[in-house]
Amino acid sequence: MTIVEELLFTERFLWEGKSYVVHIYRHAAKKERCLHMAETVLGPGDTIISDGHSAEEALHKQQTILPLAILSRALL
């Protein structure tokens, strides 16, 4: 099975004065449906990933979960 990954676009997510980069990818596997993925690297070995049926859905999920992810790291 061949998996193809394509960067569609990059967005900035602003939270409490900081900017976080969100990359939106499309993954397509032969003979399977397409999946979209949003990825944000918060630090070394710390990556947040959300998926969706569309790029917009993946981005919306990522924007919803990022504040919680960022705040949870501040507690550590």
Per-range role (PLM):
Residues 43-76:
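Mixed-charge, Lys/Arg-enriched low-complexity segments
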Residues 26-47:
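Short aromatic-glycine-(Arg/Gly/Cys) micro-motifs in beta-strand/loop hairpins
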Residues 17, 29-30, 56, 60:
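Generic cytosolic/nucleocytoplasmic N-terminal low-complexity/intrinsically disordered segments
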Residues 21-23:
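Short linear proline/tyrosine/threonine-rich motifs used for host-factor recruitment
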Residues 1-19:
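Negatively charged, low-complexity tracts enriched in Asp/Glu with abundant Ser/Thr
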Residues 13, 25, 38, 55, ...:
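Compositionally biased, intrinsically disordered low-complexity segments enriched
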Residues 6-7, 25-27, 44, 73:
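Compositionally biased, intrinsically disordered low-complexity segments
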